[in-house]
Curated annotation (Swiss-Prot):
Substrate binds at residues 26-29, 82-85, 95-98, 122. It comes from Streptococcus mutans serotype c (strain ATCC 700610 / UA159). This is Ribose-5-phosphate isomerase A. Gene3D superfamilies: 3.30.70.260, 3.40.50.1360. It is an enzyme of class 5 (isomerase).
Amino acid sequence: MEELKKIAGVRAAQYVEDGMIVGLGTGSTAYYFVEEVGRRVQEEGLQVIGVTTSSRTTAQAQALGIPLKSIDEVDSVDVTVDGADEVDPNFNGIKGGGGALLMEKIVGTLTKDYIWVVDESKMVDTLGAFRLPVEVVQYGAERLFREFEKKGYKPSFREYDGVRFVTDMKNFIIDLDLGSIPDPIAFGNMLDHQVGVVEHGLFNGMVNRVIVAGKDGVRILEANK
């Protein structure tokens, strides 16, 4: 599985060209993309500016010598490569398993060519088997948790090393164990209107293409946008 992730990540780096502003994703598959961009910067003299989606990716990019700017210093991003936890046939996806969904969505929204790299196990008919992350402000988080509980969403606060996980933006994450999300657009819209919800892991209609690595090689799926 790890080899498939590496193949997909390295393949995605082919979309990066000199002079681009590049969104650097977070997670186990995006890691290999960032490594390949770093290799090209060091060995080929590739001239790019990176915009990162988490503190982890920032540290990785700095170690590789990739020049960085903050999202506030750029008007748009030419290409962003990131992973995804699930992708459905309509190119909707769940992201945020690594806890970076807010920064990932901000960068993705400003990206001209948004690419996901996944192994074939992430391609599903219906979203929802993977728990849906919902990033919430700390104030009133318990109230939101109870509300999700009443609605039957099977919520759980994300924890790390036995303590409540805090995102780079100092928020909590409530993971919803929904099983199935038949209408991700409607569910995402509902969460968008929940006071106290900062962002959620439904990335609906955002991606331009998905690079899928499987036992039979690499497939590139183009979204009809």
